[in-house]
UniProtKB/Swiss-Prot annotation:
The lineage of its organism: Eukaryota, Viridiplantae, Streptophyta, Embryophyta, Tracheophyta. Transmembrane segments: none annotated. It comes from the Eukaryota. This is F-box/LRR-repeat protein 15. InterPro entries: F-box-like_dom_sf, F-box_dom, FBL15-like, Leu-rich_rpt_Cys-con_subtyp, LRR_dom_sf, LRR_FXL15/At3g58940/PEG3-like. Keywords: Leucine-rich repeat, Repeat.
Length: 990
């Protein structure tokens, strides 16, 4: 809330409205903004100046805050207009026509209770000012007949004040009107008549702030009266608002029962404050500041009997060099902050809270026997004796803040402790002269001693004499070396940037928060607590000893504690002092070499960056997560038992011995464990095992694993040269095996695979250079692996005949990869169709012979022949029956010259870097992406190729030397479906 409308609610204005027929002259908001001074002042229009037209504001009803109010409003809404009328709607012109048909007598009938007309769109209420500017004279007609009760041509000062207030508010906050200032509307409106009772309207208005109340006052007379109710105007906030004395007096006379006034930052703040204190007899809270406050103001406060709270800030009191007297019998809270004054004398028998923070008085005389809170922080001119005198004069004092008062001494604190037996909170931060010697504060609960140079280990003896202490802050106490406290009620302690601090010993059953950081000399920590749940001690580089007896501790973070030894593992085992531990972080603890945990509650363990760890043994039946990134020297690992569901040991290249007992594990990755020779894997639910590059893994280990993990579905044995026929024969114990990767192995015979893996769907044999040409004959001659869908023979040495037979017979394959096959020659299905028919006839007598290609559709979807140097021609006619082929990749086939494809479902074709390509014929109506990077095709060839691709969206022609970038428009003309054409700068050769 910023500024308030008050005089616009007078009866005289209502009479003026009736006399003028409720007419509103159309004004421009821009005119009002031109008359403003831009500094947050109220805008005052001259007598001959036209007042700005204020847009009609939307009424927002908060249904969630007042269901009863919304239900009542909904009843009026539905009873006024049938539902079908709301659904069908009316045009803006219809609304204007209806408005023009209304007579002036109807508009003024029962002016006090006249209806507020709300124009509603589909989802929100709108004003009728939304009629388009194209309507011409109809706009003024609507304004004349459906006026919301704003005064007409002869505007009163109070109406203009209300408008000026809203304009100032919007300008100050940098917001624009929500209204439609140009009198136009981009949607059709509906006119809805709503009769709201005074009680219901009062309830709705209770949810509005003062700015919205001012806007609502301009709707109609009933709303004006309702929004002026004094219940809504008990708090008058003019903070940083330039309000004149006349306006403020009018406000005070209009609302004499206001209880709270804020004129902080207003001009003539002293006069405004005097007026508020002398006029508003029910004033309880007064806030002033930013200016000169005279002594007479403080004298006038005594006459304001209901006053309870006064705040004065950023002000000069009196002439700055005189004594200010303040006397009040009922004042309970006083704040005089950042003020310039020589001396203060305060007599307030009921005062409970006093703040003089950052004021520069040299003396403060207090007569406040019931004062409980005294804040004199940063009062640098207050001497030690003045502070002592002020504090001991308040025997009921419970909270004292003397931070940044450099003159405070131990003697002053001792006398305060004797005089104020109920002192609970003491903030003596940045007081270099105190050491708390002989200071007894038995009732103290909060003690803050930030940056106190006199606090040493000897001070802990006197702190220990405060048995009720709950919060202790010792940050930046540079002379503090040891802290040893036995305080049963201590709940929180903070030790930050204590450079010489070496030893911490805390015995407190209620301790729940410990903050220790940037203490480079800290070596030993001993903690006993039943309430501590989380302990974070990051970057304590010299910490060597940790003793914990914390039965509720659940999370521990010891990251970058480089000096911690293996003995720390005993603390977090079942026989240690943390039986409820769930999460342990030991990242970058580089002194750990052998980690052994036996903990029945531990669920998460992180050893990231522990490069010296060579042995890991976990007996944690509930552990579900472990992170070993950076443990690249780990040699032996035992997980017996654990609740892990997945484990990645591929980042442990030196792992040689592995023992896992994990009843819930489903995924295990050993990729890169090149020296792993002994592995016992007891994971009955394991479905995925990746043992890539485990060069020492042998047949006996594989056989034992398949026997103990019968549910394996995916097995990766890439680069496992020690695996032979015996190990592959053991795969018959895996009935669910569907994915097998034997790439980069020395296999010569695939017979064990064909016999043991009947359900296999994916077989990868990349770079198996020892396979003979007859190794795959069972696939296309005997019908082996009938469920096989994906086959990868990349970088193999199979001859052209074996490849041709495989392509001709294995029509059930969906994915085939022949990347880098040097024996791969032309893919010409056009010239071999008759040959293939004869070929199938040879094996027709066999029961396992597959259906001939002439009668069976090929299921191939993805064919990859990347980098096959001997392919020169690719021909796939309709007779080849590649009805499912969607992706064909022939990139890097440098000798490929001719491509002729007729594939009805081909979506992606990659011919990038086929630098010899000359002929491209495409009959692919569904082709969406064509890649021709670095090809020597000319523009005519590309145009001819894409002319039959009606669905082509992406065409890549980058680095094509015979194609100019300026010719891209031709391709779009030939193929209108193109959305993306990639080309390089013009490289067209002459």
């Amino acid at each position: 809330m910023r500024i308030w409308c008050f005089s616009c609610f007078t009866d005289e204005d209502e009479d003026e409205e009736d006399d003028n027929g409720g007419r509103v002259k159309k004004q421009s908001l821009a005119t009002a903004m031109d008359n403003s001074n831009g500094d947050g002042d109220f805008v005052n229009f001259g007598e001959n100046e036209r007042a700005p037209r204020v847009p009609r504001w939307r009424l927002r009803l908060c249904a969630e805050e007042s269901e009863a109010a919304w239900a009542e409003l909904d009843r009026f809404w539905t009873s006024e207009i049938p539902l079908n009328q709301l659904v069908q709607g009316e045009s803006s012109s219809n609304v204007v026509a209806e408005a023009e048909d209304c007579t002036m007598e109807e508009a003024d009938h029962d002016s006090y209770h006249k209806r507020a007309k709300v124009y509603s769109g589909l989802a929100e209420c709108r004003s009728v000012s939304g009629v388009s500017s194209d309507a011409g004279n109809s706009v003024s007609s609507v304004e004349r007949t459906v006026s919301f009760g704003i005064a007409s041509s002869s505007r009163t000062d109070t109406d203009m004040f209300c408008q000026n207030f809203i304009l100032n508010y919007n300008r100050k906050d940098g917001k624009k009107d929500d209204g439609d200032d140009n009198g136009s509307s981009d949607t059709e409106d509906f006119e809805v008549h709503i009769d709201l009772t005074d009680d219901l309207l009062h309830m709705v208005f209770s949810f509005l702030n003062h700015v919205d109340l001012c806007r609502s006052a301009m709707v109609c007379r009933q709303w004006r009266v309702a929004s002026a109710h004094e219940d809504f105007w008990r708090v008058l906030n003019f903070e940083n608002i330039r309000i004149s004395m006349e306006q403020f007096e009018n406000m005070c006379s209009r609302y004499p029962n206001a209880t709270e006034v804020n004129v902080y930052g207003a001009p003539a703040v002293n006069a405004l404050a005097m007026k508020a204190a002398t006029t508003l007899r029910n004033l309880e809270v007064l806030t002033i500041g930013k200016g000169h406050i005279s002594e007479s103001f403080f004298q006038a406060l005594g006459e304001c009997n209901m006053l309870r709270s006064v705040t004065v800030s950023d002000a000069i009191l009196g002439n700055g060099a005189q004594e200010i007297h303040l006397s009040h019998d009922r004042l309970r809270e006083l704040k005089i902050t950042k003020c310039r004054v020589m001396r203060l004398s305060i007599r307030c028998p009921q005062l409970r809270s006093l703040s003089l923070k950052r004021s520069n008085m040299s003396q403060a005389m207090l007569n406040c026997p019931l004062l409980q809170l005294l804040d004199i922080a940063s009062c640098h001119k207050l001497l030690d004796a003045a502070i002592r005198s002020a504090a001991i004069s308040c025997p009921q004092l419970e909270s004292l803040d003397v931070s940044n008062c450099s003159c405070v001494s131990d003697e002053t604190l001792r006398e305060i402790a004797q005089a104020c037996a109920n002192l609970h909170i003491l903030n003596a931060s940045y007081c270099p002269n105190i050491s708390l010697e002989s200071v007894h504060l038995p009732m103290l609960t909060v003690l803050k001693l930030h940056s106190c140079e006199g606090i040493t280990s000897a001070s802990m003896t006197w702190i220990a004499n405060s048995p009720a202490l709950e919060v202790l802050e010792l940050d930046n106490c540079n002379l503090l070396t040891t802290v040893s406290l036995h305080l049963s009620r201590l709940q929180s302690i903070s030790l930050v940037h204590c450079r010489k601090f070496t030893d911490l010993n805390l015995q407190s059953i209620m301790l729940s928060s410990i903050t220790v950081s940037n203490c480079p000399a800290l070596r030993r920590i001993t903690i006993t607590s039943n309430a501590l749940r989380r302990l974070a001690l990051q970057k304590q580089e010299n910490l060597t000893t940790l003793v914990l007896q914390c039965h509720s501790l659940q999370e521990v973070d010891l990251s970058d504690c480089e000096s911690l030894s293996n003995s720390v593992c005993k603390i977090f085992s079942d026989d240690g002092g943390c039986p409820m531990l769930k999460s342990l972080i030991l990242d970058n603890c580089e002194s750990l070499t052998a980690v052994r945990f036996c903990n029945s509650s531990l669920a998460s363990l992180s050893l990231v960056g522990c490069r010296a760890v060579t042995s890991l043994e976990l007996k944690c039946p509930r552990i579900e997560q472990i992170c070993l990134d950076g443990c690249d020297h780990l040699e032996t690992a035992f997980f017996q038992p654990v609740a892990l569901r997945s484990l990645n040991l591929g980042i442990c290249p030196k792992l040689s011995v592995l023992n896992i007992e994990a009843p819930y594990m489903v995924s295990l990755e050993l990729k890169g464990c090149g020296v792993l020779s002994e592995a016992s894997i007891m994971c009955p639910l394991l479905t995925s095992l990746d043992a890539s590059f485990c060069s020492q893994l042998r047949d006996d280990c594989l056989s034992a694993t398949t026997a103990s993990c019968p549910l394996i579905e995916s097995l990766v044995l890439m680069s496992c040269p020690s695996i032979g026929s015996d190990g592959l024969s053991s795969l018959n114990g895996l009935p669910n095996l569907t994915v097998l990767d034997l790439s980069y192995t020395f296999l010569m015979n695939l017979e064990p695979v064909f016999k043991s893996c009947i359900q296999l769907k994916v077989l990868k044999l990349q770079a198996c250079k020892y396979l003979t040409d007859s190794s795959l004959e069972p696939l296309y001659k005997e019908g082996a692996l009938p469920a096989l869908e994906e086959l990868d023979l990349s970088y193999g040495t199979l001859c052209q005949t074996a490849i041709d037979d495989l392509l001709a017979c294995c029509t059930h394959l969906t994915h085939l990869s022949l990347n880098g096959c040097v024996n791969m020659h032309d893919l010409d299905w056009g010239s071999t169709s008759v040959h293939l028919f004869d070929y199938f006839g040879v094996y027709s007598s066999s029961d396992n012979t597959q259906e001939p290609a002439e009668t069976a559709n090929r299921l191939l979807q993805n064919l990859n022949c990347v980098g096959c140097p001997n392919i020169r021609k690719v021909l796939i006619p309709p007779a080849a029956r590649f009805y499912h082929l969607s992706t064909l990749n022939l990139s890097l086939s440098v000798n490929l010259k001719e491509v002729d494809l007729t594939c009805s479902n081909l979506v992606l074709l990659n011919l990038s870097n086929c630098c010899s390509l000359e002929v491209l014929k495409l009959g692919c109506p569904r082709l969406a992406s064509l890649f021709l990077q670095s090809c020597n095709m000319d523009e005519a060839g590309v145009e001819a190729a894409i002319s039959g691709c009606s669905s082509l969206e992406t065409l890549d022609l980058r680095f094509c030397p015979k194609i100019s970038s300026v010719s891209m428009s031709k391709f779009r003309t030939v193929c209108p479906s193109l959305k993306r054409v990639f080309s390089s700068p013009n490289l067209l050769q002459d």
